[in-house]
């Protein structure tokens, strides 16, 4: 292949050896050829062009110094100071800046084949795909190598061999200051193994509200698609009903596990307020302001009557509105004064006392027939309204009957005989009058009843459970016959009340025994709920439930005129104690109940029967009863089923022991007419009548298979007593029968009778149950007591056994 022409300015042989000068060539040839250098174009004529370009060697150091020593242009001011402007651009001395050349520009405004030859400077072969968009212009420029291409090659050689470019580059090296990065220190092995602490901190949580819209404007591009989609959905819903293409299927979804959260808030305080307006309040509030307003209005109108006709109607309207404002101000002031007075009135003690008596009057009107039957008074029927003439006729007839009273005396005697015969045919029964109960006593067990010694209309009731595991809150209430709907006094306690009793010498004192062993004394005259005295801090307090408390008057001297009152209590800890009121409650033990061994007689020889070892030497006490005449003697019932006769003078031994019951003795009471006879009941379902001179019972009654909780003698007959079983109340009359009770009253399902008590002055019986109710029953058609001595009658009934 012939060599390409070289530049005319420098006649340098391009084929010289490599050691003489550095050579770089750009050749175009067939890429498949291994010996030659060339380029295969995309032209159909397959014209091959070969060029060889030679670059000048690098400049010598002497030339560099000459170029650097060349002084640049300096600007001096009149004083001779160098004010030459500093260059804004400082090129990197280590970077090889691109030489401004004409490689990428064509002489004729378009790129030719010479550009392609320079592009393959460091490549032996060039793929046509690398030419890109320039392939078309290069191939389509000409099919043969023209003179213009030769001239272009010559210009390229001039640009490559132009020493001015290198001089400019060396000159820029002298003015540029290079800042090199400091060399990084080598990391040792210890530094690599060192623990590095990394602290992770939570960034602030940013919340962005994003609510995608569900509406699209009708002018938007998506409006047509949305409208079409909605129309298709409506058509789908219409075609779904009755279509065979749709089938209903059941799906099961998983609900997330619920999470409970506790929220605590302040206590909400509720207050109830009531307002009462009576007719006279309304009358005063409307009439008094109107009178004052009328006087002021008349005075005001009299002064302005001369100018009314000449005034504008607007002025008249303003005057009427001002009068209305004055009236409203006066009414508001009067209401404020009434509110201030009403608060004082509602908080006054006088109002509370008046309301207390008013409530009693209303209750007596409501319960008038029942109260009349309780007091054994005639019952008056209410007169029907609208018949005053008939009432007057009745009154006149009553007066006429009183005049003819003498004439009818003989007739009355005959009628009495007939009435007695009729009463003998009608059996005795119980009629319920009312019950003492309220919301506070609902569900509580009535444990004890006691009448006030001075006021027979006042009744004390204790509420508490007998079982140890059934303990709830306790309460002691004072009820009055005049108000059966709400108690007069309420003494609440966290412990159950087991016994209550009023004092004899001081009727205002109420003794209360609790299940925790405390004995408390309340003053019923005051409204305070705190006890006057109690044994909660006494070192000698009971350690078990106090099953009974009773006030006893004991003789001090031999004559019996001087008496003092003591409070006696019996507890499950086996102690019978007396309490004396001094500065506090002083306790003294009357008896320590001890367990006794069972003895049996065989062939006249008494032998002690061996029993099991006793867990406790103390016998729990359940009840006691002091003799009606000799207050130094008393009976004590125990949990063993024994009844001990004790004396206040001996506290170590018993006077007598009565054996008959097989279970705990719940109640012992003396006959009020025969002081030697007493009555007892037990958990062994039995009721027994005893004589104090005989250790065996005279009568034993086992009418049912239920526990007998309480018994009581009648205050009007020595033969009659009442017993409270679990499911019924029995009235016994020993004069009529000793086998069957005279009256039986069965309890409601789920209710147990617990206590009984006779009224003092009337033929009524009070029965307490397990639901917190104290029912009052009237004894009707009871047999009249005999006229003979009642004390002798019971002795005659007992027969020779009592002697």
Swiss-Prot record:
Keyword Repeat tagged: yes
Major location category of this protein: cytoplasm
Feature: compositional bias, Low complexity: 143-155
Keyword Repeat: yes
WD repeats: 492-532, 541-589, 616-656, 660-700, 703-742, 748-787
Gene Ontology terms: cellular component: axonemal dynein complex; axoneme; dynein axonemal particle; motile cilium
Subcellular location: Cytoplasm, Cytoskeleton, Flagellum axoneme; Cytoplasm, Cytoskeleton, Cilium axoneme; Dynein axonemal particle
Chain positions covered by the region annotation Disordered: 1-41, 88-109, 143-163
InterPro entries listed in its UniProt record: Dynein_IC (IPR050687), WD40/YVTN_repeat-like_dom_sf (IPR015943), WD40_repeat_dom_sf (IPR036322), WD40_rpt (IPR001680)
Name listed for the protein in its UniProt record: Dynein axonemal intermediate chain 4
Organism for this UniProt entry: Rattus norvegicus
Gene: Dnai4
């Amino acid at each position: 292949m012939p060599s390409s022409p070289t530049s005319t300015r420098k006649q340098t042989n391009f084929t010289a050896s490599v050691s003489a000068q550095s050579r770089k060539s750009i050749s175009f040839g067939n890429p498949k050829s291994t010996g030659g250098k060339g380029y295969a174009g995309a032209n159909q004529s397959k014209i091959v062009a070969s060029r060889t370009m030679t670059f000048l060697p690098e400049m010598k150091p002497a030339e560099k110094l000459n170029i650097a020593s060349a002084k640049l242009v300096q600007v001096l001011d009149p004083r001779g100071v160098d004010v030459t402007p500093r260059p804004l651009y400082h090129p990197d001395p280590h970077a090889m800046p691109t030489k401004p050349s004409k490689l990428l520009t064509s002489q004729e405004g378009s790129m030719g084949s010479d550009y392609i030859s320079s592009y393959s400077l460091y490549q032996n072969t060039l793929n046509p795909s690398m030419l890109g968009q320039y392939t078309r212009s290069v191939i389509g420029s000409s099919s043969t190598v023209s003179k213009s291409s030769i001239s272009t090659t010559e210009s390229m050689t001039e640009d490559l061999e132009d020493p001015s470019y290198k001089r400019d580059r060396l000159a820029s090296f002298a003015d540029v200051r290079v800042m090199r990065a400091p060399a990084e220190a080598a990391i040792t092995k210890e530094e690599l193994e060192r623990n590095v602490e990394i602290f992770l901190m939570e960034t602030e949580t940013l919340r962005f509200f994003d609510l995608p819209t569900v509406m699209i404007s009708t002018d938007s591009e998506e409006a047509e698609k949305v409208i079409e989609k909605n129309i298709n959905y409506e058509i789908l819903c219409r075609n779904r009903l009755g279509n065979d293409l749709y089938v209903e299927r059941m799906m099961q979804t998983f609900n997330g596990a619920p999470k409970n959260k506790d929220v605590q808030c302040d206590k909400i305080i509720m207050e109830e307020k009531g307002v009462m307006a009576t007719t006279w309040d309304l009358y005063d509030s409307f009439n008094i302001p109107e009178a004052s307003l009328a006087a002021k209005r008349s005075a005001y109108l009299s002064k302005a009557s001369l100018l009314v006709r000449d005034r504008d109607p607007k002025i008249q309207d303003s005057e009427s509105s001002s009068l209305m404002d004055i009236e409203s101000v006066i009414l508001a002031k009067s209401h404020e004064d009434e509110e201030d007075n009403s608060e004082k009135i509602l908080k006054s003690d006088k109002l509370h006392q008046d309301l207390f008596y008013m409530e009693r009057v209303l209750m007596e009107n409501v319960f008038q027939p029942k109260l009349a039957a309780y007091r054994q008074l005639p019952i008056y029927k209410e007169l029907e309204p609208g018949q005053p003439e008939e009432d007057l006729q009745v009154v006149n007839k009553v007066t006429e009957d009183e005049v003819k009273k003498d004439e009818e005396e003989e007739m009355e005697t005959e009628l009495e005989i007939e009435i007695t015969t009729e009463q003998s045919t009608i059996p005795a029964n119980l009629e319920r009058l009312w019950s003492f109960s309220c919301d506070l006593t609902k569900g509580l067990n009535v444990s004890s009843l006691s009448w006030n010694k001075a006021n027979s209309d006042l009744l004390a009731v204790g509420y508490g459970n007998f079982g140890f595991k059934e303990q709830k809150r306790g309460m002691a209430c004072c009820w009055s016959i005049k108000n059966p709907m709400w108690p007069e006094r309420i003494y609440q306690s966290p412990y159950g009340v087991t016994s209550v009793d009023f004092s004899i010498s001081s009727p205002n004192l109420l003794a209360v025994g609790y299940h925790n062993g405390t004995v408390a004394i309340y003053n019923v005259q005051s409204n305070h709920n705190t006890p006057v005295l109690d044994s909660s801090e006494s070192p000698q307090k009971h350690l078990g439930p106090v099953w009974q408390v009773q006030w006893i008057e004991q003789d001090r001297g031999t004559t019996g005129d001087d008496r003092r009152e003591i409070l006696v209590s019996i507890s499950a800890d086996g102690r019978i104690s007396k309490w004396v009121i001094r500065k506090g409650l002083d306790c003294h033990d009357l008896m320590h109940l001890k367990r006794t061994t069972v003895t049996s007689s065989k062939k006249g020889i008494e032998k002690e029967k061996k029993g099991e070892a006793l867990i406790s030497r103390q016998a729990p006490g359940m009840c006691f009863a002091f003799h009606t005449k000799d207050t130094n003697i008393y009976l004590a019932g125990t949990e063993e089923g024994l009844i001990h006769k004790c004396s206040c003078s001996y506290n170590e031994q018993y006077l007598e022991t009565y054996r008959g019951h097989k279970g705990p003795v719940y109640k012992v009471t003396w006959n009020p007419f025969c002081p030697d006879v007493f009555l007892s009941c037990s958990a062994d379902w039995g009721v027994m009548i005893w004589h104090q001179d005989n250790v065996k019972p005279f009568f034993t009654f086992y009418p049912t298979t239920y526990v007998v909780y309480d018994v009581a003698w009648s205050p009007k007959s020595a033969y009659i007593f009442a017993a409270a079983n679990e499911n019924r109340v029995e009235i016994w009359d020993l004069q009529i029968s000793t086998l069957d009770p005279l009256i039986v009253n069965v309890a409601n399902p789920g209710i147990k009778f617990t206590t009984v008590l006779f009224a003092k002055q009337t033929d009524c019986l009070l029965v307490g149950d397990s639901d917190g109710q104290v029912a009052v029953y009237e004894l009707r058609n009871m047999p009249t007591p005999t006229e003979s001595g009642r004390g002798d009658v019971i002795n005659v009934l007992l027969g020779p056994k009592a002697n």
